[in-house]
Regions:
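Glycine-rich phosphate/nucleotide-binding loop
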Residues: 49-146
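Glycine-rich phosphate/diphosphate-binding loop of Rossmann-like nucleotide-binding domains
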Residues: 1-63
Length: 146
């Protein structure tokens, strides 16, 4: 599954105009296992998957601890093992200008960072700016860079 995800991320980045994508990969265990101190999943599962895609020409690096990998902003994408590992930093950067894109499926789809906001539905409190931003982003990704 990690290999498929990294290939999908690489293809999606190329589709939006990044010719040579650089992809960071988070670990499964805390701090990417600290060389086996906190588990062996990153040694046994994540590192071999990264090596497989690197052998196919994909510039993937890791595994990195999910709590610190975002500090290195030289990557074009950050792939994570768990949903919240990716959403937390994105929401901290800009809650109303953040969207989740799902790649590797037959249909490209996205959701706004705040979710459905059912708690404020029909109360006149909703701010459509996140939805508008998300629609602009996904329409650009669907069309591609050209």
């Amino acid at each position: 599954r990690i290999v498929r995800t990294l290939k999908a991320a690489n293809a999606a980045l190329k589709r939006i105009g990044i010719a040579e994508p650089r992809i960071a990969v988070s670990g499964i265990d805390p701090h990417a296992g600290e060389g086996g101190l906190f588990g062996s999943d990153d040694i046994d599962i994540v590192a071999p998957a990264i090596e497989d895609v690197r052998n196919e020409g994909i510039d993937a690096s890791g595994p990195f601890g999910a709590d610190t990998m975002y500090l290195d902003q030289s990557f074009d994408a950050y792939t994570v093992m768990f949903h919240d590992q990716g959403h937390i930093p994105a929401k901290l950067i800009g809650f109303t200008g953040t969207a989740a894109f799902t790649i590797g499926t037959p249909i490209l789809f996205s959701s706004v960072a705040h979710g459905s906001a059912l708690d404020i539905a029909g109360k006149g409190k909703a701010d459509p700016s996140a939805l508008i931003w998300t629609l602009k982003q996904i329409s650009g990704a669907a069309v591609g860079p050209d």
